């Protein structure tokens, strides 16, 4: 659901119907293919998580663009439409043995409506069996990164705050400032969104000083 194009979801995936691991069940007219609707209740937490993921995708047009990304700053925003990152910002470890990657979408290349730009989004994919740290690119002045999704919390996969407009995070949680190195647990995915700092906060003042210095980590 965070990839461009049509989401590759088959009926039942949203509530954990696995077909017992059979990836080619077209000829299985039996329990392998029959949807077990009891799983909706049994896996209600996962079902709710998928619903939030769908809502998040819908509210962020940068995640489903009609045209291919150029990876260039062709509008002079100071950021390309799409960029790749890793343990260092603006640099992807493309070695064949690497199992992690950071992807940043600049929401200014997409509109939520005629006037409002979409958000900056950073997606950290760690498919390795070990935890890794990702270096976060600096955001424009007056903004900070806030974690909105983590598939490896103590409670399991979570959205915070809920993407569909549910209860917002507490004021204390919203003020948590993620900077420089961002740890991602093994075999997990995290999503960060660029949020505006409150006027007069220390971060907002720091951001004004950094304006115009080009690409960097915070």
Descriptions of predicted regions:
Residues 1-9, 13-218:
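Carbohydrate-interacting/catalytic domains
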